[in-house]
């Protein structure tokens, strides 16, 4: 188990990896990073939400990240980032974003697309107490390209 509420399978699951036969297994350092992110961000968030939270993406090996067109600098590849979604839980993505911003330490958090009221999902990363930047961004499309602005 990665944490009380995240199984090893859930932390590495990807339909793309399964479909393409890609090995999406983290090494020990990546797994330690995943456990730290779960401890510092996911579990406190889940306790506040009061129930399950959908994880759209957690760990991505390099092959998987390349297959989905992810950034070469993606913290998902280090086990330091996850994308969470309110699908089925009793809080909105916007509420989860605000809770993380106001109550938790994090490295980077992204309001992923959506509109000004609610993102489609929330990207959040955690590095370490000393290295976290508490950086908040908003992702948007401009002429078909994803861009980010500080919020």
Model region roles, listed by residue range:
Residues 86-151:
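Catalytic cores and adjacent binding grooves of peptidoglycan-active enzymes
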Residues 40-69:
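Extended, low-complexity, intrinsically disordered C-terminal regulatory tails
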Residues 54-56, 81-85, 123-125:
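Structural recognition of the beta-strand scaffold that forms the well-ordered cores
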Residues 2, 64, 73, 105, ...:
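Glycine-rich, flexible loop/turn motifs
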Residues 72-94:
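Acidic, His- and aromatic-enriched active-site or binding-groove loops in soluble protein domains
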Residues 69-74, 109-113:
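Catalytic micro-motifs at enzyme active sites that drive phosphoryl/nucleotidyl and oxygen chemistry
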Residues 37-41, 51, 64, 80, ...:
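Amphipathic alpha-helical interface surfaces
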Residues 1-46, 143-151:
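Extracytoplasmic cell-surface/polysaccharide-interacting catalytic and binding patches
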């Amino acid at each position: 188990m990665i944490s009380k509420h995240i199984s090893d399978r859930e932390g590495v699951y990807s339909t793309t990896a399964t479909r393409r036969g890609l090995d999406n297994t983290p090494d020990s350092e990546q797994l330690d990073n995943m456990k730290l992110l779960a401890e510092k961000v996911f579990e406190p968030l889940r306790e506040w939400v009061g129930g399950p939270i959908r994880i759209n993406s957690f760990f991505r090996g390099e092959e998987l990240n390349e297959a989905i067109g992810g950034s070469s600098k993606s913290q998902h590849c280090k086990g330091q980032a996850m994308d969470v979604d309110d699908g089925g839980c009793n809080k909105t993505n916007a509420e989860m974003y605000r809770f993380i911003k106001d109550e938790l330490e994090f490295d980077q958090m992204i309001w992923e697309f959506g509109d000004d009221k609610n993102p489609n999902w929330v990207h959040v990363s955690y590095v370490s107490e000393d290295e976290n930047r508490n950086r908040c961004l908003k992702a948007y499309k401009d002429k078909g390209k994803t861009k980010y602005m500080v919020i």
